[in-house]
């Protein structure tokens, strides 16, 4: 334990917390352009074809981001909005693409958790 005199001479260092999404540069979301849209397979116990896109952000970073929901309309040169949030079974995927923003369409025929997938409220007559 340091003495008072040692603390006067050199104060204690603040512990800096590392950002989990450095490419966003402290912004809630960033705009970017898709450079490649493809599928990849998850880590060991899981099996699927997960849809991901390589995106060049306005901050200058090129990141891999996950496309959530069933079906998408993204292709190369699509303008997308990227938020933070990793995908646990895809190594290196630390970002999500926001559905229903910019060039990304919302999920069609989605009735529950619509706000997460950019789906509009269905008409009253088309229920069930």
From Swiss-Prot:
Record-level GO cellular component terms: small ribosomal subunit
Q: What would be an example GO MF term here?
A: rRNA binding
Give the matching SUPFAM superfamilies.
Nucleic acid-binding proteins
Residues found modified as 3-methylthioaspartic acid: 89
UniProt keyword Ribosomal protein, yes or no = yes
Q: Name one GO biological process term.
A: translation
Which InterPro entries does the protein's record reference?
NA-bd_OB-fold (IPR012340), Ribosomal_uS12 (IPR006032), Ribosomal_uS12_bac (IPR005679)
Alphabetized, the UniProt keywords read: Methylation, Ribonucleoprotein, Ribosomal protein, RNA-binding, rRNA-binding, tRNA-binding
Q: Which family does it belong to?
A: Belongs to the universal ribosomal protein uS12 family.
Record's function text: With S4 and S5 plays an important role in translational accuracy.
HAMAP family in UniProt: Ribosomal_uS12_B
Q: Which NCBIfam families match?
A: rpsL_bact
Assembly, in brief, is:
Part of the 30S ribosomal subunit. Contacts proteins S8 and S17. May interact with IF1 in the 30S initiation complex.
UniProt name for this protein: Small ribosomal subunit protein uS12
